[in-house]
């Protein structure tokens, strides 16, 4: 009996050791993104945030932030909801949209200016993807050309890359998010991975034609600056070629004012020229002789 007991006890110890070895914690990519906007967003900005919320199942959408000055509150909100990424959309003058990409609590933070914005409702593309599916992130080769682009790529991966087994995500990969650099601007596009076959035999043999069909939304981001901390800290990069939309609008208004001024001056010159070119009265004309 003692030998049987020892054999069974040895087996139980072996099973416990195997369970302990099997219960070793594996690395899990726990990324959660906070989607939040400021006051003053218009309907197009709101539709863009809604589209991104549908494409990012690991995100949490929150109501608008009341302040635009004290952005440090976003770190507390992210900590409250266990989010380690923040996408903050800041609206100015009901027409300009800025995107703050941050990694709380230690940073860094990247500020973008968004232009050429088109939502899914505007585009009406034929592409579609499963809600909650994970994307394939495609980056341009120029993201490896400079250190600040490498940092931007890393933050884009953390914010737009849906980790496996994420909240509300489905185990499918059926769309691609493309980030390309053209004219020092980041162009964002979303495509569906479409599979098509001519007949059942090709489908069974795995001979499928794979193509990309655009879904939307599409927009262009211009880098403004990069901060070392999360919504604060020293400035580690600044885009010297960035021109504020306020400056652009002021230049357009100034050009229109100069054109209006030149038109008014030309009209005055025409009136003066007409007065100067009036013919003098002929003393031998019928009007002068037969009054």
UniProtKB/Swiss-Prot annotation:
- One Pfam family of this chain: Brix
Localization per Swiss-Prot or TrEMBL: Nucleus, Nucleolus
Question: Which residues belong to any copy of the Brix domain?
Answer: 31-232
Q: Provide the GO biological process annotations.
A: endonucleolytic cleavage in ITS1 upstream of 5.8S rRNA from tricistronic rRNA transcript (SSU-rRNA, 5.8S rRNA, LSU-rRNA); exonucleolytic trimming to generate mature 5'-end of 5.8S rRNA from tricistronic rRNA transcript (SSU-rRNA, 5.8S rRNA, LSU-rRNA); ribosomal large subunit assembly
- Give the family, as the similarity comment puts it: Belongs to the BRX1 family.
Q: Which InterPro entries match?
A: Brix, BRX1
Cytoplasm as a keyword?
A: no
List modified residues, type Phosphoserine. Answer: 285
Q: Subunit details for this protein?
A: Part of a complex that includes BRX1, RPF1, RPF2 and SSF1 or SSF2.
This one is known as Ribosome biogenesis protein BRX1
Q: A single GO molecular function, which one?
A: RNA binding
Which miscellaneous remark does the UniProt record hold? Present with 13200 molecules/cell in log phase SD medium.
Keyword Transport carried by entry: no
State the SUPFAM superfamilies in the record.
Class II aaRS ABD-related (SSF52954)
Report the function annotation for this chain.
Required for biogenesis of the 60S ribosomal subunit.
The UniProt keywords, alphabetically, are: Nucleus, Phosphoprotein, Ribosome biogenesis
Example of a GO cellular component annotation carried by this entry: nucleolus
Q: Which domain of life is it from?
A: Eukaryota
């Amino acid at each position: 009996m003692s030998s049987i007991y020892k054999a069974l006890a040895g087996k139980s110890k072996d099973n416990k050791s195997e369970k302990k070895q099997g219960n070793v914690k594996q690395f899990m990519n726990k990324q959660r993104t906070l989607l939040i906007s400021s006051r003053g967003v218009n309907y197009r900005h709101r539709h863009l945030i809604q589209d991104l919320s549908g494409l990012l199942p690991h995100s949490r959408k929150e109501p608008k932030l009341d302040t635009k000055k004290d952005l440090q509150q976003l770190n507390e909100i992210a900590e409250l909801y266990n989010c380690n990424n923040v996408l903050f959309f800041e609206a100015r003058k009901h027409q300009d949209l800025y995107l703050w990409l941050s990694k709380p609590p230690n940073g860094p933070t990247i500020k973008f200016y968004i232009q050429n914005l088109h939502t899914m409702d505007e585009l009406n593309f034929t592409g579609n993807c499963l809600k909650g599916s994970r994307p394939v992130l495609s980056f341009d080769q120029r993201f490896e050309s400079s250190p600040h682009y490498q940092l931007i790529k890393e933050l884009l991966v953390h914010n737009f890359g849906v980790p496996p087994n994420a909240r509300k995500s489905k185990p499918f990969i059926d769309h691609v998010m493309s980030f390309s650099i053209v004219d020092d601007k980041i162009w964002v596009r979303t495509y569906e991975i479409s599979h098509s076959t001519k007949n059942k035999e090709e489908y069974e043999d795995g001979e499928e034609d794979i193509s990309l069909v655009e879904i939307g939304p599409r927009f262009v981001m211009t880098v403004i600056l990069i901060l070392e901390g999360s919504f604060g800290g020293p400035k580690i990069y600044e885009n010297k070629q960035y021109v504020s939309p306020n400056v652009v609008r002021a230049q357009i208004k100034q050009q229109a004012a100069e054109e209006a001024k030149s038109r008014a001056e030309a009209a005055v010159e025409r009136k003066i020229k007409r007065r100067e070119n009036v013919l003098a009265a002929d003393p031998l004309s019928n009007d002068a002789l037969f009054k």
